[in-house]
């Protein structure tokens, strides 16, 4: 694993009272580098399956009952408001307008993406065979062998590239683009309550200097925080 990934796992372990060990969680910034770089295929399989099955294990964190209740309540809500289903209710205010338009778009993407995905799978299987693997490509192999293939074909290493994109500079770049395209400006605010000490707040103004809103920058995953 890259040194940065190992250091992050050590920090997570320390935060959980396991100093001297390494902890990988099911949050994307932790699991995705593991799937991308870890040589141990059995561990990749374990963490991938844990990620896919999260919230559906036979324990106190099983969400099946909660999800069933949410789906039922959403159907009731949609029908009370005069819609045949929840998708129609949600899409009524969106550009797509209805489920049929969404399915048409998804199908167009699917038709274009599927042949490319199959070609990528064939290339990854060749890489597995070439490096002595005696198994068929599985979901937990995809990122790992895609990384190897990328290095072989293009000489690219994401870990080496990432050092040229520190968070602050990436944020400045995003603000610069927003200003050039839309005239937006961002001014950091130090007098607002924040959800976490690492979070930042920025006032957003339009090209005329008119207040538009507040942008909260809270980039890092942590326990209890929703992703996305």
Predicted region positions:
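C-terminal catalytic core of Y-nucleophile DNA break-rejoin enzymes
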Residues: 31-33
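A conserved non-catalytic segment of reverse transcriptases
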Residues: 27-29
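Short hydrophobic/aromatic-rich motifs at helix boundaries and adjacent loops
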Residues: 45-49, 58, 95, 146-149
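A short, flexible low-complexity segment enriched in Lys/Arg and Gly/Pro that occurs
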Residues: 49-66
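Generic structural signal for well-ordered, non-membrane alpha-helices
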Residues: 45, 72-75
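Active-site-proximal, well-structured secondary-structure segments within enzyme catalytic domains
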Residues: 1-25, 36, 73, 79-228
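Short, charge-rich amphipathic alpha-helices with coiled-coil/heptad character
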Residues: 37-54
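Amphipathic coiled-coil alpha-helices
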Residues: 66-67, 73
């Amino acid at each position: 694993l890259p040194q940065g990934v190992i250091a992050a796992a050590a920090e997570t372990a320390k935060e959980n009272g396991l100093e001297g060990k390494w902890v990988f969680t099911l949050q994307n910034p932790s699991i995705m580098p593991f799937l991308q770089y870890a040589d141990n295929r059995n561990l990749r399989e374990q963490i991938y399956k844990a990620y896919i099955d999260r919230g559906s294990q036979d324990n106190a964190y099983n969400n099946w009952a909660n999800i069933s209740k949410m789906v039922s309540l959403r159907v009731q809500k949609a029908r009370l408001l005069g819609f045949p289903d929840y998708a129609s209710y949600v899409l009524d205010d969106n550009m797509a307008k209805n489920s049929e338009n969404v399915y048409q778009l998804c199908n167009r993407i699917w038709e274009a993406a599927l042949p490319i995905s199959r070609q990528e799978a064939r290339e990854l299987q060749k890489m597995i065979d070439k490096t002595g693997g005696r198994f068929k490509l599985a979901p937990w192999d995809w990122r790992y062998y895609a990384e190897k293939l990328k290095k072989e074909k293009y000489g690219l290493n994401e870990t080496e590239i990432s050092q040229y994109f520190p968070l602050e500079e990436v944020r400045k770049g995003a603000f610069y683009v927003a200003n050039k395209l839309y005239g937006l400006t961002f001014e950091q605010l130090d007098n607002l309550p924040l959800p976490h000490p690492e979070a930042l707040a920025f006032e957003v103004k339009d090209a005329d200097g008119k207040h538009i809103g507040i942008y909260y920058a809270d980039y890092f995953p942590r326990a209890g925080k929703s992703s996305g």
